[in-house]
Protein backbone atom coordinates (compact mmCIF):
# COMPACT_ATOMS: atom_id res chain seq x y z
CA UNK A 1 0.00 0.00 0.00
CA UNK A 2 2.52 2.58 -1.19
CA UNK A 3 1.15 6.01 -2.07
CA UNK A 4 2.93 8.38 -4.42
CA UNK A 5 4.47 11.60 -3.11
CA UNK A 6 1.55 13.87 -4.07
CA UNK A 7 -0.98 11.74 -2.21
CA UNK A 8 1.23 11.54 0.90
CA UNK A 9 1.59 15.28 1.29
CA UNK A 10 -2.02 16.05 0.40
CA UNK A 11 -1.04 18.22 -2.57
CA UNK A 12 -3.90 18.83 -4.99
CA UNK A 13 -3.33 18.42 -8.70
CA UNK A 14 -3.88 21.46 -10.90
CA UNK A 15 -7.29 21.17 -12.56
CA UNK A 16 -7.65 21.87 -16.27
CA UNK A 17 -10.33 24.54 -16.61
CA UNK A 18 -12.71 24.65 -19.55
CA UNK A 19 -13.07 28.32 -20.51
CA UNK A 20 -14.97 28.84 -23.81
CA UNK A 21 -14.53 32.63 -24.14
CA UNK A 22 -11.86 35.07 -23.02
CA UNK A 23 -10.13 38.39 -23.52
CA UNK A 24 -6.77 38.91 -25.25
CA UNK A 25 -4.76 41.93 -24.12
CA UNK A 26 -2.05 42.93 -26.62
CA UNK A 27 0.44 45.52 -25.36
CA UNK A 28 2.59 46.62 -28.30
CA UNK A 29 5.41 48.95 -27.28
CA UNK A 30 8.31 50.13 -29.41
CA UNK A 31 10.62 47.61 -27.68
CA UNK A 32 8.47 44.51 -27.10
CA UNK A 33 5.00 42.97 -27.57
CA UNK A 34 3.19 41.26 -24.68
CA UNK A 35 0.12 39.09 -25.30
CA UNK A 36 -1.97 38.12 -22.24
CA UNK A 37 -5.07 35.92 -22.46
CA UNK A 38 -7.55 36.12 -19.57
CA UNK A 39 -11.01 34.81 -18.76
CA UNK A 40 -13.86 37.39 -18.72
CA UNK A 41 -13.24 38.02 -14.99
CA UNK A 42 -9.60 38.97 -15.66
CA UNK A 43 -7.81 35.85 -14.37
CA UNK A 44 -4.79 35.04 -16.55
CA UNK A 45 -5.01 31.83 -18.60
CA UNK A 46 -1.77 32.23 -20.56
CA UNK A 47 0.68 34.89 -21.63
CA UNK A 48 3.64 35.30 -23.95
CA UNK A 49 5.98 38.05 -25.01
CA UNK A 50 8.52 38.45 -27.78
CA UNK A 51 11.27 38.04 -25.18
CA UNK A 52 9.71 34.89 -23.71
CA UNK A 53 9.58 33.12 -27.09
CA UNK A 54 13.30 33.61 -27.63
CA UNK A 55 13.91 36.99 -29.25
CA UNK A 56 16.25 39.55 -27.71
CA UNK A 57 17.40 43.06 -28.42
CA UNK A 58 15.98 44.89 -31.41
CA UNK A 59 14.36 41.70 -32.79
CA UNK A 60 11.81 41.80 -29.94
CA UNK A 61 10.23 44.88 -31.50
CA UNK A 62 9.59 43.18 -34.86
CA UNK A 63 6.17 42.21 -36.16
CA UNK A 64 7.27 38.59 -36.65
CA UNK A 65 8.22 38.27 -32.97
CA UNK A 66 4.74 39.52 -32.06
CA UNK A 67 3.22 36.89 -34.36
CA UNK A 68 5.18 34.08 -32.69
CA UNK A 69 4.27 35.37 -29.22
CA UNK A 70 0.55 35.55 -30.08
CA UNK A 71 0.61 32.00 -31.52
CA UNK A 72 2.37 30.72 -28.39
CA UNK A 73 -0.16 32.31 -26.04
CA UNK A 74 -3.10 31.14 -28.18
CA UNK A 75 -1.86 27.55 -28.27
CA UNK A 76 -1.57 27.44 -24.48
CA UNK A 77 -5.03 29.00 -24.02
CA UNK A 78 -6.71 26.69 -26.53
CA UNK A 79 -5.48 23.70 -24.55
CA UNK A 80 -7.74 24.90 -21.72
CA UNK A 81 -10.76 25.01 -24.05
CA UNK A 82 -10.68 28.62 -25.28
CA UNK A 83 -12.54 29.20 -28.57
CA UNK A 84 -13.80 32.80 -28.80
CA UNK A 85 -11.94 35.96 -27.75
CA UNK A 86 -12.27 39.71 -27.59
CA UNK A 87 -9.06 41.58 -28.40
CA UNK A 88 -7.90 44.74 -26.64
CA UNK A 89 -4.97 46.55 -28.28
CA UNK A 90 -2.79 48.89 -26.26
CA UNK A 91 0.16 50.85 -27.61
CA UNK A 92 1.54 51.81 -31.02
CA UNK A 93 4.24 49.20 -31.62
CA UNK A 94 5.02 47.20 -34.75
CA UNK A 95 3.30 44.07 -33.46
CA UNK A 96 -0.26 45.38 -33.16
CA UNK A 97 -1.90 44.07 -36.33
CA UNK A 98 0.35 41.04 -36.75
CA UNK A 99 -0.58 39.76 -33.28
CA UNK A 100 -4.30 39.93 -34.15
CA UNK A 101 -3.67 38.13 -37.47
CA UNK A 102 -1.76 35.41 -35.62
CA UNK A 103 -4.64 34.92 -33.18
CA UNK A 104 -7.09 34.49 -36.06
CA UNK A 105 -4.81 32.10 -37.96
CA UNK A 106 -4.24 29.97 -34.84
CA UNK A 107 -7.95 29.07 -34.81
CA UNK A 108 -9.46 31.49 -32.28
CA UNK A 109 -12.69 33.28 -33.20
CA UNK A 110 -12.19 37.04 -32.72
CA UNK A 111 -15.52 38.70 -31.92
CA UNK A 112 -14.43 42.26 -31.02
CA UNK A 113 -11.25 44.28 -31.58
CA UNK A 114 -10.94 47.27 -29.22
CA UNK A 115 -8.27 49.98 -29.14
CA UNK A 116 -7.44 50.65 -25.48
CA UNK A 117 -4.35 52.81 -26.03
CA UNK A 118 -4.02 55.21 -23.09
CA UNK A 119 -4.12 58.83 -24.26
CA UNK A 120 -3.44 61.61 -21.74
CA UNK A 121 -5.90 64.49 -21.50
CA UNK A 122 -2.88 66.77 -21.06
CA UNK A 123 -1.53 65.01 -17.98
CA UNK A 124 2.14 64.82 -17.05
CA UNK A 125 4.80 66.81 -18.87
CA UNK A 126 6.55 64.57 -21.44
CA UNK A 127 10.29 63.93 -21.49
CA UNK A 128 12.54 66.12 -23.60
CA UNK A 129 12.68 65.26 -27.30
CA UNK A 130 15.37 62.77 -28.36
CA UNK A 131 17.90 64.29 -30.78
CA UNK A 132 19.73 61.77 -32.96
From Swiss-Prot:
Record flagged with keyword Nucleotide-binding: no
CC per GO annotation: ribonucleoprotein complex; ribosome
Gene Ontology biological-process entries: translation
InterPro entries listed in its UniProt record: Ribosomal_uS11, Ribosomal_uS11_bac-type, Ribosomal_uS11_CS, Ribosomal_uS11_sf
Listed Gene3D superfamilies: Ribosomal protein S11 (3.30.420.80)
An example molecular function term from Gene Ontology annotations: structural constituent of ribosome
Alphabetical keyword list: Ribonucleoprotein, Ribosomal protein, RNA-binding, rRNA-binding
Assembly: Part of the 30S ribosomal subunit. Interacts with proteins S7 and S18. Binds to IF-3.
Function of the protein: Located on the platform of the 30S subunit, it bridges several disparate RNA helices of the 16S rRNA. Forms part of the Shine-Dalgarno cleft in the 70S ribosome.
PANTHER family: 40S RIBOSOMAL PROTEIN S14/30S RIBOSOMAL PROTEIN S11
Family designation: Belongs to the universal ribosomal protein uS11 family.
Official protein name in the record: Small ribosomal subunit protein uS11
Originating organism: Chlamydia trachomatis serovar L2 (strain ATCC VR-902B / DSM 19102 / 434/Bu)
